[in-house]
Amino acid sequence: MACPARIHGAAVRDVPQRNEGGDRAVNFLAIDFETTGYDFGSANEPWQLGYARVEAGAVVETGEWFFDVEGAPERAHEADALGTLQSSFETWAPKLMGVRLVAHNIACERTILTRAAPLTKWGPWVDTMKLAKARYPGLPSYKLGDLCEMFGQVPVIDGRTWHDGLFDAVACANLALFLGD
């Protein structure tokens, strides 16, 4: 049985304007995977995929899927968790197809999606880390959390913080909007 994404009415703080003359009309889907990591030679499996959909310069929808894989945190094993990323492809993939995908340091997200569906064309892609480096060369750090702190883009989502797929996807969306102004 297909499980819908957990949709959230996350209290996402308004994104400050960096440049009032900027074009904020670009629509995109910011995504973030959380993975089990490589531990003692085991596979690095995604256990959470968070997303934030942006339309006309505002986060209009957020959600997440959990994947029930070995080595994942307890919440990935809840009753509404999906199987593996590959076995639940038809549930989550339509949300990501045919849209501009935004991620921070896209190598991880792009690799996971390509591994799950090698013949699927994902993207076009936008990397917020590359955008930040281009707009603000010489910063002491280009980590997502550090950039969001520097630019006042840290989301406010009850019970969530960094290294949570939903939280990081919303943070990435906020940062993309800020950098795109």
Describe the role of every protein-language-model region.
Residues I157-A176:
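A charged, well-structured terminal subsegment
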Residues R18-P124, G138-S141, G145-G159, H163:
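Conserved non-catalytic scaffold segment of RNase H-like nuclease domains
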Residues R110, T128, G165-A169:
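Conserved glycosyltransferase catalytic-site signature
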Residues R6, P16-E20, V170-D181:
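Acidic two-metal-ion nuclease catalytic site recognized across multiple nuclease folds
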Residues K121-K133:
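Conserved beta-strand -> loop -> alpha-helix junction used to position metal-binding or nucleic-acid-contacting
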Residues A116, A134, M150, L175-D181:
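Active-site catalytic microenvironments for nucleophilic, acid-base chemistry
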